[in-house]
From Swiss-Prot:
Highly expressed in liver. It is found in: Cytoplasm. Substrate binds at residue 160. This is Short-chain dehydrogenase/reductase family 9C member 7. It holds the Pfam family adh_short. The gene is Sdr9c7. It comes from Mus musculus. Its EC number is 1.1.1.-. Gene3D superfamilies: NAD(P)-binding Rossmann-like Domain.
Length: 313
C-alpha cells in the first residue's frame, strides 16, 4: 500500500513538473481580466514570460492591468455578450498570433447575480447571467477555435462547484452546468486535433462576482418587487433567513484566490493538464460528495439548509 501511495505521489509530481517547452513564445487570451481570477492569472503568466492577451470589460480595468504588468501583456475591451465585439476580438487576436496560432484560451468572464429563489426571479434575470457565463463563453470559443487548433493548444473554461450541484437558484448554476456540458463535448471533438480542454471548478472564493453589499441590496430588491401573494407564501422570516445564509456564505469565502489561478496556470503550462480542477476544500469534501450521492439524499441534505416558507406543507 505504501509503495502504491509513493508511486501515485511521484506520478502526480511528474505530471505537475512536466511543462510545455518554449512558453515565452506562446500566446494566451484571457477574458474577464478587470479583477479577480482573470486579473491575477494574467499577472502570473506575464511573470512566466508568456505573451498575454487580456480582455477587459472596462477601460479603467485595462489601464490598471497595463500599469501593473510589462510590455508582454496587451489588452482589448470585450463584452462577451456582444457577438460583433467577439468577432473583433478574434480578429485582433489573429493579428497578434499570426501563423503560430493561439496556445490557450481562458474563458474566465462571468457574473453571479441575480441569484436567489427561482420564483423570485424573472426570465431577464436568468438570461442576463446565462448570456455572460455560457452563451458568451461559447461565442468566444467558437471564434477562437481555428487559431487554437493551429497551435494544438488548450481551452480552459471557468465553471464552478455550482456546475456540479445546484446549491442556489437563478441563472448561475444553470449556466455552469451548461459550461460543463459544452466543455465535455468539445473536449471529445477536439481531441483529434491535439487540443486539450480543462474545466476549473472552484469552491467559495472571495471575488467581486458576489460582493456582500451587492448581494444584500439585490436580495432586498428581489423581495420588494414580488407580488404580495408570493411574499405571503414565503414570509418575511424566510426572506431574512435566506439573505442571512447567503451573506454568511460570502463571509466564509476563501480569500486566497491564487489556489484557483494556480490551477488555471497548470492547465496552460503543463504537458498533461487535468480535465477537471477542484480548488478549495469545500469542493473536495462537500460539493463533489453531494454531486455523487443519490439525488434524493442530496435533496434531503440541501433542503435542510433552506429556511421553511410560511405556507409550507
Amino acid at each position: 500500500m505504501a509503495a502504491l501511495t509513493d508511486f501515485a505521489f511521484m506520478y502526480r509530481w511528474f505530471k505537475n513538473c512536466n511543462l510545455v517547452k518554449n512558453l515565452s513564445e506562446k500566446y494566451v487570451f484571457i477574458t474577464g481580466c478587470d479583477s479577480g481570477f482573470g486579473n491575477l492569472l494574467a499577472k502570473q503568466l506575464v511573470d512566466r514570460g508568456m505573451k498575454v492577451l487580456a480582455a477587459c470589460l472596462t477601460e479603467e480595468g485595462a489601464q490598471k492591468l497595463l500599469q501593473d504588468t510589462s510590455h508582454q501583456l496587451q489588452t482589448f475591451l470585450l463584452d462577451v455578450t456582444k457577438s460583433e465585439n467577439v468577432k473583433e476580438a478574434a480578429q485582433w487576436v489573429r493579428d497578434q498570433v499570426g501563423e503560430q496560432g493561439l496556445w490557450a484560451l481562458v474563458n474566465n468572464a462571468g457574473v453571479g447575480l441575480p441569484s436567489g429563489p427561482n420564483e423570485w426571479l424573472t426570465i431577464k434575470d436568468f438570461v442576463k447571467v446565462i448570456n455572460i457565463n455560457l452563451v458568451g463563453l461559447i461565442d468566444v470559443t467558437l471564434n477562437m477555435l481555428p487559431m487554437i487548433k493551429k497551435a494544438r493548444g488548450r481551452v480552459v473554461n471557468m465553471s464552478s462547484s455550482g456546475g456540479r450541484v445546484a446549491i442556489f437558484g437563478g441563472g448561475y448554476c444553470v449556466s455552469k452546468f451548461g459550461v460543463e456540458a459544452f466543455s465535455d463535448s468539445i473536449r471529445r471533438e477536439l481531441h483529434f486535433f491535439g487540443v486539450k480542454v480543462s474545466i476549473i471548478e472552484p469552491g467559495n472564493y472571495k471575488t467581486s462576482i458576489l460582493g456582500q453589499e451587492a448581494l444584500e441590496s439585490r436580495m432586498k430588491k428581489l423581495w420588494d418587487r414580488l407580488p404580495q401573494e408570493t411574499r405571503d407564501s414565503y414570509g418575511e422570516e424566510y426572506f431574512q433567513t435566506y439573505t442571512k445564509k447567503l451573506v454568511n456564505l460570502m463571509r466564509s469565502a476563501e480569500p486566497r484566490i491564487s489556489d484557483v489561478t494556480n490551477s488555471m496556470e497548470h492547465a496552460i503550462v503543463s504537458r498533461s493538464p487535468r480535465i477537471r480542477y477542484n480548488p478549495g476544500l469545500d469542493v473536495k469534501f462537500l460539493y463533489l460528495t453531494l454531486a455523487k450521492l443519490p439525488t434524493p439524499v442530496t435533496d434531503f441534505i440541501l433542503s435542510r439548509y433552506l429556511p421553511r416558507p410560511a405556507d409550507s406543507v
